[in-house]
A protein has these predicted regions:
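C-terminal accessory/tail domains of diverse enzymes
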Residues: 1-70, 85, 99, 161, ...
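Metal-dependent DNA replication initiation modules
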Residues: 77, 81, 94-115, 119-122, ...
């Protein structure tokens, strides 16, 4: 998010940020998003989570320096504590203007930011097998990453208010239980053929195949403020996918369990109680987090990312830090202070 350095109000200055980083040798790119007061950072393809850990801070520092040169600041979180997203100008690009025309207020409310992690897949069917295996664990990932308790100047009572706002969109939130990649592909092709979708990128589930990139895209985490946590959650997602591909992360719970867990994780963060991915028990998120970290530990060791996973604290999430603020203005100031290491 792009903020006034003094008031911490959002500022529609994305093109000023883009000009400020133009020509720099960066490990990725800085680009526009729906709102002109927000920018997106994408790393280039990384072979390891350690590469992500180097690339993301470099991208964020470059954007912060470009902002400072304009008398601005940046802040990373899943929502701005007091700005109203409906009041934010839209980037005047055809895809965004069309999107707002299609979705109306449900799109104008999408002043929310998340962390998206792409993991390369061996084949389309492996991608779908991996999706089915990792999906039951994703509400726990939301609980651990929850970072949006404020919205429009109010405490929402949610650890992640981003999650229910995202779910206001069609084809968002919980992924439906297709039986195979081929079944999903046929559904997408039918919706494109009859004019519902332009392509599969108009599907915004918490996890989705991305055939053009050959990846499984996990979109569940709230945007971390601490950039080191971004790399940690990327490492967690990679290790979970690797474990699933090895047959070690089988989740047998039905999709209604996912819906329940998604809401509980959004509401309570790490203090949620969640249905176990195998459907056998109802337990604190902290206990389930310990089980998940143990489950993915062999894959993380093999991938060289064990130290990154150690950054994840199963007993707390960044929403807790925001809740220590006495006002939304104080919360915004804290985000600015913590966003650039």
């Amino acid at each position: 998010m792009i903020l006034d350095a003094e008031t911490h109000e959002q500022v529609a200055a994305v093109h000023r940020i883009l000009r400020g980083v133009e020509g720099l040798a960066l490990p990725g790119r800085v680009k526009t998003e729906l709102f002109a007061s927000v920018f997106e950072t994408n790393t280039f393809v990384c072979a390891t989570a350690a590469e992500v850990d180097a690339a993301l801070p470099a991208l964020r520092r470059a954007a912060a320096e470009a902002a400072a040169a304009e008398g601005l600041a940046i802040a990373a979180a899943a929502t701005h504590p007091f700005a109203r997203p409906e009041a934010q100008p839209i980037v005047k690009e055809e895809r965004y203007v069309t999107f707002v025309g299609y979705g109306g207020i449900s799109v104008r409310r999408q002043g929310v930011q998340g962390l998206h992690v792409h993991v390369g897949m061996p084949s389309p069917e492996d991608c779908w097998r991996c999706l089915d295996a990792v999906a039951p664990w994703l509400p726990l990932v939301l609980a651990l990453s929850a970072n949006s308790p404020w919205f429009g100047g109010e405490l929402t009572g949610m650890a992640s208010n981003r999650a229910p706002i995202l779910a206001e969109l069609p084809r968002a939130g919980t992924p439906p239980p297709f039986r195979s990649y081929g079944e999903w592909e046929a559904w997408v092709e039918r919706l494109v053929r009859i004019g519902v979708l332009e392509d599969y990128t108009r599907i915004w589930w918490d996890v989705r195949p991305h055939p053009a990139l050959g990846t499984l895209e996990v979109r569940m985490p709230d945007q971390p403020t601490d950039v080191r946590l971004s790399a940690a959650f990327a490492a967690l997602v990679q290790a979970l996918c690797a474990t699933a591909l090895d047959g070690g992360a089988r989740g047998g719970s039905p999709r209604p369990d996912y819906v329940q867990n998604r809401w509980s994780a959004a509401r309570f963060g790490v203090r949620a109680k969640l249905i176990h991915p195998d459907g056998s028990s109802f337990l604190p998120a902290t206990e389930l987090a310990a089980e998940l970290l143990e489950l993915v530990a062999p894959a993380a060791a093999r991938l060289g990312s064990a130290k990154l996973l150690a950054r994840i604290d199963p007993s707390g999430c960044e929403a807790d830090m925001q809740l220590e603020a006495a006002s939304p203005q104080e919360a915004a100031a804290g985000l600015v202070a913590r966003s650039v290491a």
